[in-house]
């Protein structure tokens, strides 16, 4: 690895990938952030190709998590359950943030992952008028699973990610907002949550393959911004 890839990042960053939002915390190495983004993107594309996310949400989620595992992530916790909500005004993003906060607290004993996810979500709402965001939105508004993830690198150089996926249907509006800002349209919904830690020894062996398969898609349908 080059010295450039080992530089420690100093800013929190959010990456919009194929309609899903990935937040990466400051303090990650540039290499770790790059690897996480590509793995997240690759797993999303594989799951999208294998299953209809709206009609086969459980299979889509399982495929996504299984691909992440095959790429070198260990999965100490994963679930996919029918949830209930008494409030239909809550956004998909708010539900996902709560799930990430709870799972992150259980894993790391703090609020850092939940706070990071919330910051990324809040920042996204302020860049709604960005032409690139709007273009990205139009391409991905029909997704059946809406994902939000937060990732950090600990002082021990462990890369930890929590992913929350919520089953949702796009509103039938031309100007609908990004999926994570959709409102729940029913009191029951399916939600998947997974805690992942990166085994860099394994990912080192597949990094080149992932990057080659992504090709130009590693920059297309991806929008990154500081938070």
Model regions and ranges:
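Short juxtamembrane and helix-loop transition motifs at transmembrane-helix boundaries
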Residues: 74-77
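Membrane-inserting effector segments that mediate pore formation, membrane fusion
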Residues: 79-134
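Short amphipathic alpha-helical coiled-coil/interface segments
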Residues: 64, 68, 116-117
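C-terminal assembly and membrane-engagement modules of membrane-active proteins
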Residues: 1-40, 44, 48-49, 61, ...
